[in-house]
A protein has these predicted regions:
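Transmembrane helices of ABC transporter permease
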Residues: 31-43, 78, 85, 155-206, ...
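Short intracellular "coupling" helices and adjacent cytoplasmic loop segments at the cytosolic face
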Residues: 2-9, 105, 113-137, 141-143, ...
Length: 600
């Protein structure tokens, strides 16, 4: 199972990530404005206005003593100003928190929908080449990346920009020389941080990719825990996990070392800045005649600015992590859909159910050059006809059914249903006209009732029970303590193979689609279970166009027609009796069967 694109983070990926984040953010322009306003206003009032008023108080104290009975008269306006500044500042602080919550909740909702829609509409080829656990992890990291970026923007980036502007604007008229030196130090500081950012960004992306792979390895082992245990391969899986864990740890370590190097250098620049401001504060009055209040203001503003600049390192680190976390899902979202509907694609209308495979050519995307499954295959299935597909493994039986369902697009030829090209119709309308029962029952970790009704969610309890009865599933469902409300576990692990298959068949019965595809639908059943289901399947197929894939030839012997495939070609076509009498490939397969199974 490959993990796609773990290369270092590229500028184009960063731009696309930021564009996607902005697309969901700009849907709330008022909240965005309030978040910027509250962040800038909060810093201006509680950091700069507060200090400015205190500087005025210091200057007034320095101007001369004030009698006790005149304190409120003299300092009353200053006290009132401080109270108002802090009151409004605290209100803006809470508004800042509120807007962040609103942005993150709404943004993550839209991003989750975007990821779900993208993943659910991607082709089966896309999903079979990836770990499901990694996709879940990438979705979670994509959302946490958005949350992290909103946090760092509102709580760090905007306050830092506000601090730089206010500090330079306040100090330039008072100490222009010091302001020039301060600006030069800031330029050097920001340039260094930017260079380190460009170095650390790909390291963060590599760390995120390693952690996603770790999640995929863990998910793969947990999902297939029965195979791990029955094969006694716990140690092997632990070694795989340890290798992925070490890779994630090593990636984290490399990233951490780069961050520590950056932090040491930026701390040195902060120390230099504070040394310069200390000299100016100490000699400011003697050299420039600056008042005590102004010296307090200079020191406080500069100190606050250096603290903000000190946060720039951690701010860039958080931006690195946020964009690195989001990078892999951004690439997934950017991938073209391998199977996509035309913008104006009509819905498929099935009136009879005739199926035609016309001059079909198909090869899997990861196949070697010149290695195809079908090359100019043509097959007609009349409306209402029951057709069995048989042949050795790899002959193309299941692939043909997948092309009918348009789980992949053909490279040449057409698949028609009632004369309509399925590639020109919407995928959803096509699949709602086909009841599909695969070899491995596809059950959700939900109740038996919900699983049966999945293809027809508006079905009544009576209809659900009747479908289960026809699939001979009620005989085990009624014995369960919670009956139809029994949770089946992930992929139906709480049920036996035969029970899972009967639930899947009940779903197909309830769907009542005009076309039926059975892909080894009874292969997981024991002889007793198969006997219970066979009659239900015969009733289900009556009056429906049915394609039955089987290795167990007794499953298809009674069908209207049997098509024998070999190496992607039709080598025989006829009824069971005709094919046995012909003495060809089918007769050979029939004669070699033991226990009703086709020799692999």
């Amino acid at each position: 199972m490959s993990q796609r694109n773990t290369s270092p983070l590229k500028r184009s990926t960063v731009r696309r990530t930021l564009q996607r984040f902005w697309d969901v953010t700009r849907t709330q322009p008022l909240i965005v404005f309030l978040s910027v306003f509250s962040s800038a206003g909060y810093i201006f009032l509680l950091t700069f206005a507060n200090t400015y008023v205190m500087a005025l108080i210091v200057d007034r104290v320095q101007a001369g003593p004030v009698a006790g009975d005149q304190v409120f008269e003299v300092f009353g306006p200053y006290i009132l100003a401080l109270v108002l500044v802090n009151l409004v500042g605290q209100i803006l602080s809470k508004l800042q928190d509120y807007t962040v919550y609103k942005l993150e909740i709404a943004g993550n909702y839209h991003l989750a929908r975007l990821c779900f829609d993208t993943l659910s509409n991607q082709s089966m080829t896309f999903h079979t080449s990836r770990f499901g656990g990694s996709l879940v992890s990438q979705t979670s990291r994509f959302m946490s990346g958005y949350t992290g970026l909103v946090d760092v923007t509102v709580y760090s980036l905007i306050p830092t920009i506000t601090s730089v502007i206010c500090t330079v604007a306040a100090l330039a008229p008072v100490v222009p020389t010091f302001t020039v030196i301060l600006v030069c130090i800031m330029v050097v500081y920001i340039a260094f941080v930017w260079l380190m950012y460009k170095r650390i960004m790909p390291l963060s992306a590599a760390t995120s990719a390693a952690q996603n792979k770790l999640s995929g390895v863990l998910s793969d082992a947990v999902t297939n825990i029965l195979a791990v245990k029955t094969c006694g391969r716990e140690d092997f899986e632990r070694d795989l996990f340890d290798a992925a864990d070490r890779a994630a740890r090593d990636a984290e370590t490399v990233s951490m070392h780069a961050m520590m190097q950056r932090n040491f250098t930026t701390s040195g620049l902060i120390v230099i800045t504070m040394a310069v401001v200390s000299v100016f504060v100490a000699g400011g009055n003697a050299w420039f005649g600056i008042s005590a209040g102004s010296l307090v203001m200079i020191f406080t503003y500069t100190y606050n600015l250096t603290m903000r600049l000190n946060y720039v390192s951690s701010m860039m680190q958080r931006i690195n992590r946020a964009l690195g976390d989001a990078a892999e899902m951004t690439r997934v979202l950017d991938e073209p859909r391998l199977v996509a509907d035309d913008p104006d694609a009509p819905e498929l209308k099935v009136t009879e159910g005739a199926i035609d495979f016309e001059h079909l050519s198909f090869a899997y995307r990861d196949a070697a050059a010149g290695e195809s499954v079908f090359d100019d295959l043509t097959l007609h299935v009349a409306a209402g006809q029951r057709v069995g597909l048989v042949g050795k493994s790899g002959s193309g039986k299941t692939t043909l059914t997948k092309l009918l369902l348009r789980l992949d697009d053909v490279q040449g030829g057409r698949v028609l249903v009632d004369g309509q090209d399925v590639s020109r119709c919407t995928q959803q309308s096509l699949r709602r006209q086909v009841a599909y029962v695969p070899q491995e029952a596809l059950l959700f970790h939900r109740s038996i009732r919900e699983n049966i009704a999945y293809g027809r969610p508006d079905a009544t309890d009576e209809q659900i029970r009747e479908a289960a009865r026809l699939a001979n599933a009620t005989e085990f469902i009624d014995r369960l303590p919670r009956g139809f409300d029994t949770m089946v576990g992930e992929r139906g692990v709480k049920l036996s193979g035969g029970q899972r298959q009967r639930v899947a068949i009940a779903r197909a019965i309830l769907t009542d689609a005009p076309i039926l595809v059975l892909d080894e639908a009874t292969s997981a059943l024991d002889s007793e279970s198969e006997a219970l289901v066979q009659e239900a399947l015969e009733n289900l197929m009556r009056g429906r166009t049915s394609i039955v894939v089987a290795h167990r030839l007794s499953t298809v012997a009674a069908l209207d027609r049997i098509v024998v495939l070999a190496d992607g070609e039709i080598v025989e076509d006829g009824t069971h009796t005709q094919l046995v009498e012909a003495g060809g490939e089918y007769a050979s397969l029939w004669s070699r069967q033991t226990g009703a199974f086709l020799e692999a």
